[in-house]
């Protein structure tokens, strides 16, 4: 009763501004202090600045007189909001009076109307929140692009229209109505400006706005009037408030507004879908249809998701929504089957129509129902697409057809018909996103599970397993299928274990147990079928995969009937020209299956009798298959002959080979031409002929074998191995001369390096056969072999030739052959060849005879090998007592040996000088060493030395000292310093100065004396001078 009296007392304060207060009706509106200003305005009413100044002063006085607000609001303050105090109510009346008199003078002043309406709003709507003030401040700073972006405007409308306080809509209804009426007057005076419209429409978003204005038709008509009045460039600002109002109001009215906008701009569809699902009363059917619509548009590049989602992601969102609200979105199983039957009937009717008779005019056919998607809703009832006229403005030069999809009930949110989820997933999902079939099939099955259609879900899983073509999709479906089966079994077991269910009369325990048994049996069968299902997936992906067919056959194990069925299906399915891998093993294994009597029992015995006739039929069929390669066809014939041999049908095997190797009249067929059937190229298959020759060698006669080999060589398909086999066969049968002729024929057919292998075998066989009996013939053969032999291959032939001469000929001729070999072989073999030559010359003629060989070796060998040969040469001279010659050879070799890389050489020379030399020779060796080191002391040589030392595993060389570098740069100055130091030592020892006689001999770049051995102090007076002829 107290609350009623409070409301009545508060309601009595209103209306405040209706009718408009005037000084006549409300004398307190003009205090005595304001009379001068009022008189001034009466005399000069057209001065807008005076009016605004007067209003500003009045607002300041009202604000100063306003009492301070406490922390806790009283009931009056909660209901009346800003108008809770008498000072505020009087101030409102006073301001309204002044504003109304000013507007009467300036009815089209935008500045005056805006200030007036904002003032009225502040007393009715309350105060904006801090977030709303900040949002409006940020919006004011944005550019012109923001004013046309409806998405940002919609978000801004939600942020910028939040208030605290406000006048109660019941108590202050009269004041709310007066505010709305004032807004109507403002937009009538300023109809073409957007701000007045936005201020007026913003009132309708206030949470305390009376429902008669907010939820009724008034708000919708006000927004529509704004869209009709303002130019299209400003419609975005209106739509931002309009859509926000539609979200606040909700219901059918709000949904109709959203549908109107989304027809023009579908970019906000995802936001609207979120709103539909998060509303107090979710509308999943409409949301699903919206999702399906944008998924289809995105797939046709007619829609771009603001959230960056792909068409597939949008369709998955639709599928997830269907899974979540299965009962509210999709049809039941009966409805789905009925719709499928209708579609099939329509398709059969269209396919069964008779073709038009020639000369008869075609009659227009009646447009079918919307099942085939041929209808488009333009306005009113559905009309055929062909009857929809293209709208063309009067002033337009041309018009284009709108890029929109034809009308479909599945994408019309206003249509209450439930969706055919199964058909949609098959048409829009599985046929479009074939690489994501696993997710789509499991989603469809989950939909049926959520609806309780477990049999339909099981059938869906089975269809998915039978349709996917990737292991990933198969695994996804199979795991979901197994999980569903386990869940069903667990649920049935829990139901049987629940005692409450046993006491329930409606619970049929026997039926539940029977269903549980069936489920468990199906689950076991599913697990057993997994290898076969995986194999099916791989074969669907590539039915020409031979290996997978072999795995399929192996999976059947001992089931002979299934094995035969798998073989037959594989051979009927595989395209021989597209087979992956060799195809012939399938035919061979199939024939062996019959040959061996099928699978074997536990004792290893065949379960059936061998069936050679059936095996021969399979081989016969295989010989007519157009394989990709001739070798596969050759393998078939060889395996067929092998089967006959295993069954001791030797004559039949020979006949098969004769049949397979039949030579046609036209032998100029290109063996490598894949356009020619392999059967026509089979006679040139070396594999087939090789098997035939081996077969003849085993069970045939010598003459028949020779005939086969001769035919191979006649067809010019023989290789080196065939030549060797043929010659070896003749040799084993004591046809030695014929075997040698075969070698010669092979040499004529082939060039090096293949001819080298034949020569190598031929010569070794010839020498082994005749030895020294036919020496001249053997020499001719060797000369013939070496005549065109490349230097890369001639070394073994020279060695064999020389060995022949050593064993059966003359040593002098052998030395000549070694000499020829040393100058003929390639550079990498010369060092070894000279080593052999020197060893043979030493053995036959002694050490002195090797001097000219060494000299020729030093001229022809590379630097590195020359150094090694010099060391050997020097050792030989030292053995002969020729010390000076050995020293000269060391000096010659020094130019090739970097001390940092070849320390062994210098150590050997050092030891030589210590053992056989003098102080002068030792000093000369040191001088040469420094000169050589100087010649190698360059950046490139140093890097090469480092690399060579690293490859040898020794310590890396380091740079010489400054003094050594200086000495290397000036070898003569270094020698003078050394001699001066030696003289000083002698003076200290002998007490008198010592002088060293100098000699002026010519030296080369490395400091080696180029004078004769007889000149200078370093000459050996006992040296023996010999000419080359005396060797």
Curated annotation (Swiss-Prot):
- Function text: Involved in pre-mRNA splicing and cell cycle progression.
Subunit relationships: Associated with the spliceosome.
Transport: present as a keyword of the record?
Answer: no
**Regions annotated as coiled coil:** none
SUPFAM superfamilies for the chain:
TPR-like
State the HAT repeat positions. Answer: 28-60, 90-122, 214-248, 250-269, 452-487, 610-646, 664-698, 700-732, 734-768, 773-807, 845-879, 881-915
Arranged from A to Z, the UniProt key words for this protein are: mRNA processing, mRNA splicing, Nucleus, Repeat, Spliceosome
Q: What is the predominant subcellular site recorded for this chain?
A: nucleus
Q: Where in the cell is it found?
A: Nucleus
**Would the keyword Phosphoprotein be found if you checked this record's keyword annotation?**
no
**In which family does this protein belong, per the annotation?**
Belongs to the crooked-neck family.
- Which region ranges are annotated with the description Disordered? 346-368, 948-969, 1003-1031
Q: What name appears for this protein in its UniProt entry?
A: Pre-mRNA-splicing factor SYF1
